[in-house]
């Protein structure tokens, strides 16, 4: 059991501060240029806000990217399908930066850096699940993850004659322009109210019996 789709890239370091991005999935946009001195999200930057955000997030973690790069991406994850194409770009960028600059980070760290970039740079209040699944995924296994503690274990999946089917609903899904942030805020409000009467750290700590009381 494994998704046979993904995001792929080739990159090269530059001797200056320029950042040049090209996606074969958005070839109509051509090459989008920026620089290490301009790590500010913008509508004009389009999809490159994701790799730029990761470069920014590494800097926030004390790992400065000291030279620019040329990055070409190609992916077959349907955009807006809920399969985390943006998170895959973030994790892939993290892999490339780790390789280029020798940053001492684990795959789990790359997931957290991707989440940081999405939360603080792209202003989407996502959780860790998408980036974690991409960075830590293992063939023929699901991941049982406690997102509050990041404790996890692999759960082998042997489907035999069964299949997991991903269907296209033709409904585009993007966290940035969806009700995600609103739903997240509602859950946080509910947690704060519940914490006034029960001792829980997350909504996941609330068992059914206590809830029914």
What are these regions (language model features)?
Residues 4:
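Conserved short S/T/G-enriched processing/targeting/catalytic segments and their helical context
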Residues 1, 10, 28-157:
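Gly/Ser-rich oxyanion-binding loop with an adjacent helix/lid
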Residues 8-46, 59, 141-213:
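C-terminal nucleotide
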């Amino acid at each position: 059991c494994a998704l046979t789709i993904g995001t792929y890239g080739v990159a090269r370091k530059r001797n200056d501060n320029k950042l040049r991005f090209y996606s074969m999935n958005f070839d109509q946009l051509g090459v989008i240029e920026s620089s290490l001195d301009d790590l500010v999200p913008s509508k004009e930057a389009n999809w490159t806000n994701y790799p730029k955000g990761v470069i920014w997030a590494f800097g926030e973690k004390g790992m400065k990217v000291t030279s620019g790069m040329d990055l070409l991406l190609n992916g077959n994850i349907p955009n807006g399908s809920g399969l985390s194409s943006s998170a895959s770009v973030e994790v892939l960028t993290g892999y490339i930066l780790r390789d280029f600059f020798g940053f001492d980070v684990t795959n789990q760290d790359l997931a957290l850096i991707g989440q940081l970039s999405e939360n603080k740079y792209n202003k989407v209040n996502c959780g860790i699940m998408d980036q974690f699944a991409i960075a830590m995924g293992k063939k023929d296994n699901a991941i049982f993850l406690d997102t509050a503690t990041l404790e996890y274990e692999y759960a082998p999946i042997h489907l035999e004659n069964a299949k997991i089917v991903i269907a296209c609903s033709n409904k585009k899904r993007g966290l940035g322009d969806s009700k995600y942030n609103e739903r997240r805020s509602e859950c946080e409000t509910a947690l704060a109210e519940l914490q006034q009467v029960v001792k829980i750290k997350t909504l996941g700590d609330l068992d059914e019996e206590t809830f029914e009381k």
